[in-house]
């Protein structure tokens, strides 16, 4: 899947926007066309957060993603809100630790991955978002693997460099899941 039109959604504080930045930065590393559009609910932490990320080899007409071919959701309200927007043939990756009721659609692939539980079990609390990005990469190969590592190097702030290795471990956990 060379072009990815994705929506990532969950509660504020789950790292949705960070995960979107990792995907967008991977496209930047590869000098591809990209857009990253964040959306916040009225509250930050605990409110709703989502972002649209598009990576393409062609010019992108709009940063808005209305019919994603990839959806990552980290809570039930986000699943319920976005499931019907996924384009036929698209992929949904849901954190099944927190998304318990998954509506079925015959025209898309839905992957239930207990990312929060997996991350906590591996000592990676708070990195379920990156576990889900790893799973998305494993299913779509939306960029070169090295580009994801470079993106993490770029996106993790200098004052939190100790988090680089943990994010890469979470990414690998998702890839192997």
Predicted regions and their residues:
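Active-site cofactor/cluster-binding pocket
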Residues: 1-177
């Amino acid at each position: 899947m060379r072009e990815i039109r994705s929506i990532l959604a969950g509660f504020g504080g789950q790292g949705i926007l960070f995960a979107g930045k990792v995907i967008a930065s991977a496209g930047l590393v590869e000098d591809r066309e990209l857009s990253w559009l964040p959306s916040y609910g009225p509250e930050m932490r605990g409110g709703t957060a989502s972002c649209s990320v598009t990576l393409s080899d062609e010019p992108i007409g709009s940063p808005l993603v209305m019919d994603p071919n990839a959806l990552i959701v980290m809570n039930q309200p986000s699943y319920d809100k976005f499931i019907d927007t996924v384009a036929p043939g698209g992929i949904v990756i849901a954190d099944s630790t927190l998304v318990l009721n998954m509506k079925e659609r015959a025209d898309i692939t839905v992957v239930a991955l207990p990312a929060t539980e997996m991350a906590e079990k591996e000592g990676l609390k708070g990195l379920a978002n990156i576990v889900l990005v790893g799973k998305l990469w494993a299913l779509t190969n939306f960029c070169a693997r090295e580009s994801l590592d470079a993106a993490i190097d770029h996106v993790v702030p200098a004052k939190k460099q100790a988090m680089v290795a943990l994010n890469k471990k979470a990414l690998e956990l998702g890839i192997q899941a």
